[in-house]
Swiss-Prot record:
A Pfam family assignment: YqzH
UniProt name for this protein: Uncharacterized protein YqzH
Gene label: yqzH
Length: 68
């Protein structure tokens, strides 16, 4: 499941111009994004994984929420 989540995070980041194949996430970034995802899933368990990932990446790219 972890590799799947990392792949989804990479695909979501690509929409904002970051290619993780060329510019990979640091271990700290991965940990922060996964922690934010877990928190979001706990807060809104009925929301699907894709929506959570899109929200987390948007917050990350725009320095909002947990990333501000």
């Amino acid at each position: 499941m972890e590799k799947f989540v990392e792949k989804m995070l990479g695909q979501a980041l690509r929409q904002y111009g970051r290619n993780v194949a060329i510019d990979p996430l640091s271990p700290y970034e991965k940990q922060s994004l996964k922690a934010a995802l877990q928190e979001r899933r706990n807060e809104e368990p009925d929301e699907d994984l894709h929506a959570h990932i899109e929200d987390i990446i948007y917050d990350y790219v725009t320095n909002q929420g947990l990333f501000s």
